[in-house]
């Protein structure tokens, strides 16, 4: 169990502890080169991976006891565990480095779990904008066809209609200038007709639950456009924590899953708007 793994890692000066099958090939090569032995630097690297594996295991157990068992909103100790999925070209600015980590465990679902079918690698800003677009369009998960267009993490067009094409045309009409180079998210499987319309202007990313083969063929002509398939959209009412780093600490709050209803809207001007307004 974990105790044996930690014990072996602690003694990495003379023990090689392998917890990742991806290291089997390098281990065999190292042993072949050294007549059954391994180098210290290699063992130290294996030990680091072993400690990371046991730390992740312990963090997942800690999270279960803190949230699932005791129903604590904010536990005394917040144990975080994530696995690096990829290193990104740069961060929010070109001089910053960046990487994408995904939470350990089987239940995470969102833009980080989307499948990219085409296009160059996503940047830090692409992920940030696509996340904002997916979170917003998920508000309409069970609604009529809806299209969201986001630029710099802010919506510049949102519309619902009888068809996905009509919703896209209406969303684009909100601010066609800002939509150039933006991120699009939809709440329905993407069809070829809508894909053709989207391909008419430069778009960084399109995120959809699914896409028809014909829609994929349309986007295949746009080599720089990234098509992300998300599967079923996340539940906008799901609970969870939102975390933000500040200098010297973390700010943690519950997810913003509140919904605005018609009853909550009030007229605060002297004159009420007309139905057309």
State where each predicted segment sits.
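ATP-dependent carboxylate/acyl-activation modules
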Residues: 57-59, 63-277
């Amino acid at each position: 169990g974990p105790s044996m793994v930690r014990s072996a890692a602690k003694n990495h000066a003379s023990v090689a502890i392998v917890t990742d099958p991806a290291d089997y090939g390098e281990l065999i090569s190292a042993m072949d080169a050294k007549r059954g032995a391994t180098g210290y630097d290699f063992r130290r690297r294996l030990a680091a991976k072993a400690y990371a594996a046991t730390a992740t295991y312990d963090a997942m157990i800690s999270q279960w006891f803190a949230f699932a068992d005791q129903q604590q909103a904010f536990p005394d100790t917040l144990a975080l565990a994530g696995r690096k999925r990829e290193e990104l070209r740069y961060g929010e600015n070109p001089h910053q480095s960046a990487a994408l980590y995904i939470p350990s465990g089987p239940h995470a679902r969102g833009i980080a779990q989307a499948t990219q079918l085409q296009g160059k690698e996503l940047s830090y800003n692409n992920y940030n904008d696509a996340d904002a677009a997916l979170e917003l369009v998920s508000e309409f998960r069970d609604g009529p066809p809806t299209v969201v267009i986001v630029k710099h993490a802010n919506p510049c067009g949102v519309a619902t209609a009888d068809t996905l094409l009509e919703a896209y045309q209406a969303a684009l009409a909100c601010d066609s200038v800002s939509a150039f180079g933006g991120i699009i998210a939809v709440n329905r499987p993407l069809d070829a007709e809508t894909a053709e319309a989207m391909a008419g202007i430069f778009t960084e990313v399109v995120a959809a639950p699914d896409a028809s083969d014909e829609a994929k063929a349309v986007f295949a002509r746009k080599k720089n456009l990234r098509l992300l398939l998300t599967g079923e959209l996340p539940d906008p009412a799901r609970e969870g924590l939102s975390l933000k780093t500040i200098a010297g600490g973390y700010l943690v709050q519950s997810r913003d899953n509140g919904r605005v209803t018609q009853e909550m809207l009030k007229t605060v001007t002297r004159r009420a708007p007309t139905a057309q307004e």
